[in-house]
From Swiss-Prot:
Function in brief: RNA polymerase that catalyzes the synthesis of short RNA molecules used as primers for DNA polymerase during DNA replication.
Gene Ontology MF annotations: DNA binding; DNA-directed RNA polymerase activity; zinc ion binding
HAMAP family hit by this protein: DNA_primase_DnaG
Residues given in the record as Mg(2+) 2 binding sites: 314, 316
Species of the source: Listeria monocytogenes serovar 1/2a (strain ATCC BAA-679 / EGD-e)
This protein's name: DNA primase
Record-level GO cellular component terms: cytoplasm; DNA-directed RNA polymerase complex; primosome complex
Cofactor: Zn(2+); Mg(2+)
EC identifiers of the protein: 2.7.7.101
EC class: transferase
InterPro entries from the UniProt entry: DNA_helicase_N/primase_C, DNA_primase_core_N_sf, DNA_primase_DnaB-bd, DNA_primase_DnaG, DNA_primase_Znf_CHC2, DnaG_bac, DNAG_N, DnaG_primase
Gene name tied to this protein: dnaG
Length: 626
């Protein structure tokens, strides 16, 4: 198993910027000293995910996951610790030497995880073979010529790892079998098909192959395109598998992530060739859905990275309909700012770039975007005879309903003027009609609010409460916490952040244990961490803790706000609070026992328990809690 020197791990951890790394996966906004965004580990519409650049940690107050930059990538991308250190170093452009093992050991993984890891490995190997066949063999010559004639450079073929599946039944079957791969598993992965006689054969034959990656950049599927005949579907995609769900996958999303984040917008296209041509033309933030309409899962994925989308679909009727559906989803579900780039009729982005050139496409891309409202007003014209008065009135009413949805008065004025000019109406007349539309729109929103489901009671614990103690940075919803919980938090946080504090508190605690088991477990980890001679560093401490729940507890503690100055008097107060709570809990247990003995007329035990309660009351009243 590969190991990395401790000093290299420390260098990467200390020099990496957690905001920059996580920002490649989550759209982060600055709030006070920290950054917040939608958690990538559970579905949510209100941000509860917080990243601290000062402490170099993340924590989600919704699902409880937390950690440092390494644990984020381990959780999000399914990496080993060594792989996560390597990826952080690469993403941070750090010049450190980290070697990864050639093959990942999956023997200790659960069966399901082990099988999916092997499926991914099979796809990686298969993609390399397909690409080699296209670029280096005689069998790939026709496909290579076809791609070059379409204007694709060899550089793009390599960037996108495009390949060719020859017209044989056993190219991939034999290739995988020679490497000891399970052919039944390869079938379940969508690489092979089973014939009626039970023999496994290649699923893809005589097709140009486009690898499909997940949001971790791993190849998990293929789309094969016919190029020299018409005896089958133009595109053949991998079936749904344990590693591939087309409702959740956008072509080129992982590779475009950095450009999307930098430009603060994403470009949606329909086809693989459109995305590849756009990349070659310099538009690097383009993605495409996998032969399906944009889904809610796609929309949520986009929302996590940006608030703006440019839809650049085909210029035919089907493309316009698809743009309307996609834009409606993004606006109504995710509240994105949507623009539409309409190409000439019958042209897709790939056609346009090949016919007009990259520079013309970039010019159109930057200068001819339609706002979502402008596109919808244009869309509402379709199949309407605007020479007919009834059709005109219906069209104007529909347009006013769209204009009524706009928040900005300037925008409303602009579109009203356009309508007034086109139909020779006064803008005052349209404004009167618009006011009625606004009233109707407000009534609709009020009715919708009456029908909203009640807030789940389980969420109320996270809601701000009157008189709540603000223990956390304001990114976390305020909670009213008990004194003993506050004490445990402050003691553990103080110990993690200072070896001197650890030694002092350990001495003051003596035989006293933490009330909550997870704090007691974390305390045990901390004792071992300092016993190994490590310095106080919560982010480094996280790496020594194998349990994900413990990492989440550490990150939550690091979000706790502590008093400016804490020393022995404060620590003694916290420990007294902890001891008092334990005695109070013991008293409650004895009172329950007393009630039981009283019902059972067990006088002997009743007297014994009463004496114990009297003794506890004396301790609590005197302050002698030991």
């Amino acid at each position: 198993m590969a190991r990395i020197p401790e000093e290299v791990i420390d260098q990467v951890r200390n020099q990496a910027d957690i905001v920059d790394i996580i920002g490649n996966y989550v759209q982060l906004k600055k709030q006070g000293r920290n950054y917040s965004g939608l958690c990538p580990f559970h579905g949510e519409k209100t941000p509860s995910f917080s990243v601290s650049p000062e402490k170099q940690i993340f924590h989600c107050f919704g699902c409880g996951k937390g950690g440092n930059v390494f644990s984020f990538l381990m959780e999000h991308d399914g990496l080993t610790f060594v792989e996560s250190v390597k990826k952080v170093a690469d993403m941070s452009h750090l010049d450190v030497a980290i070697e990864l093992p050639e093959e990942r050991d999956t023997s200790n993984l659960p069966k399901e995880t082990s099988e999916t890891a092997k499926m991914v490995e099979m796809h990686q190997l298969t993609a390399k073979l397909y690409h080699y066949i296209l670029m280096e063999t005689e069998e790939g010559t026709a496909a290579l010529t076809y791609l070059k004639e379409r204007g694709m450079s060899e550089q793009m073929m390599t960037t996108f790892q495009i390949g060719f599946a020859p017209n044989h039944h056993a190219t991939i079957t034999s290739f995988l079998e020679k490497r000891g791969m399970d052919l039944q598993l390869a079938g379940a992965a969508g690489l092979l098909s089973e014939r009626d006689d039970g023999q496994m054969v290649d699923r893809f034959r005589n097709r140009i192959m486009f690898p499909i990656t997940n949001d971790r950049g791993q190849i998990i599927a293929f789309s094969g395109r016919l190029f020299d005949r018409d005896d089958g579907p133009k595109y053949l995609n991998s079936p749904e598998t344990p590693v591939f769900n087309k409702r959740r996958i956008l072509f080129h999303f992982s590779e475009a992530r950095q450009a999307i984040r930098k430009q603060e917008e994403i470009t949606l296209m329909e086809g693989f060739m459109d995305v590849i041509s756009a990349e070659e033309a310099g538009v690097q933030n383009a993605v495409a859905s996998m032969g399906t309409s944009l889904t809610e899962e796609h929309a949520d994925l986009i929302k996590r990275l940006t608030n703006r989308a440019i839809i650049c679909y085909d210029g035919d009727r089907a493309g316009i309909e698809a743009a309307y559906k996609a834009g409606t989803l993004l606006v109504e579900r995710n509240r994105l700012d949507v623009f539409v780039l309409q190409l000439p009729a019958g042209k897709d982005p790939d056609d346009f770039i090949r016919a007009s050139g990259p520079e013309k496409f970039k010019e159109v891309y930057k200068q001819q975007r339609m706002t979502w409202t402008a596109f919808k007003i244009h869309y509402l014209r379709k199949e309407r005879n605007l020479q007919n008065e009834t059709e005109q009135i219906g069209y104007i009413d529909d347009c006013l309903r769209e204009i009524a949805k706009l928040d900005q008065a300037v925008e409303r004025e602009l579109y009203l003027k356009q309508l007034a000019d086109e139909f020779e109406l006064t803008i005052e007349t349209l404004k009167q009609q618009l006011q009625q539309s606004l009233k109707n729109s407000q009534k609709s929103r009020q009715m919708a609010s009456y029908n909203e489901p009640p807030i789940d009671d389980s969420f109320m614990g996270m809601m701000p409460q009157e008189g709540a103690e603000m223990l956390f940075s304001f990114e976390q919803p305020a909670q009213k916490l008990s004194a003993h919980t506050i004490s445990e938090q402050q003691l553990m946080k103080a110990m993690m952040e200072s070896r001197d504090n650890f030694l002092l508190i350990k001495q003051l605690l003596g035989d006293t244990t933490f009330y909550h088991d997870n704090y007691e477990a974390l305390y045990t980890y901390l004792i071992g961490y300092f016993a190994e001679g490590n310095d106080a560093d919560p982010t480094k401490f996280m790496d020594s803790v194998p349990d994900a729940a413990m990492k989440g507890l550490i990150s939550s503690l690091e979000m706790v706000i502590s008093p400016d100055e804490q020393g022995k008097p404060q620590f003694e107060d916290y420990i007294r609070s902890l001891k008092r709570y334990k005695l109070e809990q013991k008293k409650k247990e004895l009172e329950q026992e007393l009630a039981t003995y009283n019902r059972e007329n067990d006088n002997e035990n009743e007297i014994r328990v009463m004496l114990e309660i009297v003794q506890l009351n004396r301790q609590l009243n005197s302050g002698q809690l030991d």
